[in-house]
Amino acid sequence: MYSEGLKEKARKLGYWDGKEPFKFWKVIHETGKKPFTIRDFFVLKTLAPSLNLTMDMEELPLSVKPEQNVSLADMNRLLRETYEGTEWDMTKDMMVTKKIKDKDGTERDTIYKSPLAQNWMTNDMFEFLNAQRGEKKIEKQRTISVVWCAYSFVIQCRDWLPDEVGGVCWWSEDNPGESPRVPLFAGMTDVPESFKVCGHKRYRPDAALWTY
């Protein structure tokens, strides 16, 4: 679905030659960046590994068919993802050196991951730790789970149960990597009072956001 005359206008303005397939992200996207980010890539690659998707590709499929059944736990795990243990782990090489003494008094250097390195560092902290690495910098990645997330949810549909309880929204406030998920059933006509209070712009101890 697109605006009437879009292709004709794009061709008239020189954005499209009329010969190549009309790909919206190529014709209209003004930054020229790829039409996907590492978040899209990571989810699709995880669900369909045999496709051998890579970040070097020009574009990714809009969707993929999961190669295995996807459970509720799988979905929650993806929403908590920070790429820890993968090649995109931003903290894996943020090491610091500390001098320690052995039992015999011999001084030596020990290298360990900085206790300041974690998956939700501020930009300033990330740059500070990166500055200690010399020329070999770690690229900052946009993780799926982020501290500035307002909320996330997973919809589960269970057709073998009555509609009132078969449909459930697993709701999470704030960072999906740190907050629990609360079931909100399709048959509910009301929610707890704390879910009716907005706590995004101010501190409200009676808001579910600040509880979680």
Residue ranges and their predicted role:
Residues 1-212:
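C-terminus-biased signal that marks the final domain/tail of proteins
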